[in-house]
Amino acid sequence: MKFSERCMIRLLGDMRSYNYVIVPIHDFDQVIYKIRAIDFDQQSYEGEFSLYRPQLFKDNEPIIDLVKNKLLVESINQYKIEERAIVVKRLLGSKNKIESLIESMKFDKISSDEKVNKLTQQIYFLTKDNSFKNLKSMGEVLEKSFNYLISNYENHEMLRINKVF
């Protein structure tokens, strides 16, 4: 769940099963599994918002089924909320670095105008936030997404993540 949230928030696309690894972390009485991306060529590139949601890829169905069978819906939602809070704290804690990166992304032609327009329309549809209208680059999309996340992270319904296009 946390991996899916990070992909959506960071606009990290195409996270099919062959583009990430599962790292087991052994503790005294349990094993925690963390998912780490290993392929970043689709970050902030795609115009289809669903491509930033790894749980929608057919290749990932076995893991999604495992999560559904092992975790309660309440736990899944709690993990999503926790991950958003962690991301917000990281954004605020690294504000200067993030701003510098975003500024360079604004002027870099990472994706086509069509993909930027399509993605901003879909995010606007989800958020109803006017700041997502008329954006010109993926850097601007990411900046507005981070700002939205920071200003709304206590709102557990933000981005209505269960909505599918």
Q: Where are the model-predicted features located?
A:
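C-terminal catalytic region of ATP-dependent kinase domains
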Residues: 27-165
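Active-site acidic catalytic loop and adjacent metal/ATP-binding pocket
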Residues: 1-42
